[in-house]
Amino acid sequence: MNLISIPAFQDNYIWVLSENNGRCIIVDPGEAAPVLAAIEENQWQPEAILLTHHHQDHVGGVKQLREKFPSIVVYGPAETQDKGVTQVVGDGDRLSILGHDFSIFSTPGHTLGHICYYSEPYLFCGDTMFSGGCGRLFEGTAEQMYQSFMKINALPEETLICCAHEYTLANMKFALSILPDDRDINDYYHKVNELRAKKQKTLPVTLKNERRINLFLRVNDIDLIDKINKETNLQHSVARFAWLRSKKDDF
């Protein structure tokens, strides 16, 4: 399958998996216009929509797309039932779409009902994980988001993280503020800065990359523990995760 990202709003990405014959799967269409334009340009035939959570910038285009393509199947968690979903899915479910298998797992934190879709090598993680960061805790707890990150971290290192926002540069600036001497973070920051200066995308990224530069995956690293312990003594990984999220909220 071919992976395409369609820019939307200020910093969203709507992901599309397309076959050479034009049949495609659309992920989190927050608005319909750019998707419809891409469909016309590429002569796609939409077969399914995957929704990760209920926020409007991820579901806003569903109604118009269903009107245009009445046979399209819309999958999503229970919290998206009133957003145009035709089939509710949840943790442990498996889908076969266009001959490709998708595993679904619950990733609460950003919202309580947030889910991710994994079809090797792609992970569509919505607003759970960003490159270098994690989603805001609008409904869930740091404990829930930490456990969601651990689920993602259990996937193969070559997994391609297809998150829904271009937040990478801001996240790397935050990471540098925490660990300014970290070589991996510095190197990645400069790479991302160059890409964004050229208006190029930083996504998708590999899980291997995130394990190196995403502080929320490194809460048990000695360098980060030492940094945190200079301000407060936090013995538990979840507490350190919560500390990081709080710092990012105020950054």
UniProtKB/Swiss-Prot annotation:
Pathway: Secondary metabolite metabolism; methylglyoxal degradation; (R)-lactate from methylglyoxal: step 2/2. Zn(2+) 2 binds at residues 57-58, 127, 165. Its cofactor is Zn(2+). Binds 2 Zn(2+) ions per subunit. Keywords: Hydrolase, Metal-binding, Zinc. Its EC number is 3.1.2.6. Pfam families: HAGH_C, Lactamase_B. It is an enzyme of class 3 (hydrolase). Zn(2+) 1 binds at residues 53, 55, 110, 127. CDD domains: hydroxyacylglutathione_hydrolase_MBL-fold. InterPro entries: Clx_II_MBL, Glyoxalase_II_hydrolase, HAGH_C, Hydroxyacylglutathione_Hdrlase, Metallo-B-lactamas, RibonucZ/Hydroxyglut_hydro. GO terms for molecular function: hydroxyacylglutathione hydrolase activity; metal ion binding. SUPFAM superfamilies: Metallo-hydrolase/oxidoreductase. The keyword Zinc applies. It catalyses: an S-(2-hydroxyacyl)glutathione + H2O = a 2-hydroxy carboxylate + glutathione + H(+). GO terms for biological process: methylglyoxal catabolic process to D-lactate via S-lactoyl-glutathione. HAMAP family: Glyoxalase_2. Monomer. Thiolesterase that catalyzes the hydrolysis of S-D-lactoyl-glutathione to form glutathione and D-lactic acid. This is Hydroxyacylglutathione hydrolase. It comes from Klebsiella pneumoniae subsp. pneumoniae (strain ATCC 700721 / MGH 78578).
